[in-house]
UniProtKB/Swiss-Prot annotation:
Keywords: Cell membrane, Cobalamin biosynthesis, Magnesium, Membrane, Transferase, Transmembrane, Transmembrane helix. Its main location: membrane. This is Adenosylcobinamide-GDP ribazoletransferase. GO terms for cellular component: plasma membrane. It is an enzyme of class 2 (transferase). It catalyses: alpha-ribazole + adenosylcob(III)inamide-GDP = adenosylcob(III)alamin + GMP + H(+); alpha-ribazole 5'-phosphate + adenosylcob(III)inamide-GDP = adenosylcob(III)alamin 5'-phosphate + GMP + H(+). The gene is cobS. It comes from Mycobacterium sp. (strain JLS). It is a multi-pass membrane protein. The chain crosses the membrane at residues 1-21, 35-55, 59-79, 101-121, 123-143, 171-191, 197-217, 227-247. GO terms for biological process: cobalamin biosynthetic process. One of its GO terms (molecular function) is cobalamin 5'-phosphate synthase activity.
Length: 248
């Protein structure tokens, strides 16, 4: 378990985890990925708190700093995956052409727009979270829920897209029980994130459900999942949860 958690940090962050202490990327590492989300969320929550202290409550700059820390801590690979996935979904042609577009490396109009929307929405939503403990929990919930969505994308029965090295190693590795346990845990964690005790859990479940539909569409369009699809699942879910938690 320690090796899987270390592998999850090596895969999902810029932390210099010694390779000898990590498990090979696969089922165990992906199962531990939401644990990485808890730590990343706590770091982002601390930055949000410090920014709110420096710039005033509900400062958009504080929210932007929290998002920037997440991007730096993950090498921007998830937001890049979102951009590539949106570009792939936005092109015409066979799955092979869509996969070529995704592997091109440059961001098209759709991809660039998706980055702006995701970063902007997360920034504003984080800045609108209540101060104190509830707001910190909200950030942790949003970031962790994104990693739970990655497990949804890797659940049993989901294939890898042709030629996807990462997809081939993680697709279909997560039993439904693992996904449900993590989903229930994050939904429970979300209870104190809002004044209405049902809003947080409902937001988490709805966001993960929406991402499951996105993943299903990606499987139809691309023939399976890729690393980019995992990044898109993480960013979409994080954004939807963050926005859902600040609905009045």
């Amino acid at each position: 378990m320690i090796g899987s958690l270390a592998g999850a940090f090596a895969f999902g962050t810029v932390l210099p985890v010694p390779t000898g202490s990590t498990a090979t990327l696969g089922r165990g590492v992906m199962t531990a990925l939401p644990g990485v989300g808890i730590v990343l969320g706590a770091v982002a929550a601390a930055v949000l708190w410090a920014g709110s202290w420096a710039f005033g409550p509900h400062s958009a700059l504080a929210g932007l700093l929290a998002v920037a820390v997440l991007l730096l801590a993950t090498r921007g690979m998830h937001i890049d995956g979102l951009s590539d996935t949106v570009d792939g979904l936005g092109c015409y042609g066979a799955p092979e052409r869509a996969l070529r577009v995704m592997r091109d490396g440059s961001a098209g109009a759709f991809g660039a727009a998706s980055i702006v929307v995701a970063v902007g929405a997360q920034t504003l939503a984080f800045s609108m979270l209540p101060g104190g403990w509830s707001g910190a929990v909200g950030v942790v919930v949003a970031v962790t829920a994104g990693r739970v969505a990655a497990l949804v994308a890797c659940r049993r029965g989901i294939p890898a897209a042709e030629g996807s090295a990462l997809g081939g190693r993680v697709a279909g590795t997560q039993p439904a029980a693992v996904v449900l346990v993590w989903l229930a845990a994050v939904a429970a964690l979300a209870i104190p994130a809002t004044e209405r005790i049902w809003q947080g859990p409902l937001t988490v479940v709805v966001a993960v459900g929406m991402t499951a539909l996105l993943v299903r569409h990606c499987v139809r369009r691309f023939g399976g999942i890729t690393g980019d699809v995992l990044g898109a699942a993480i960013e979409v879910t994080t954004t939807v949860v963050a926005v859902g938690l600040v609905i009045r």
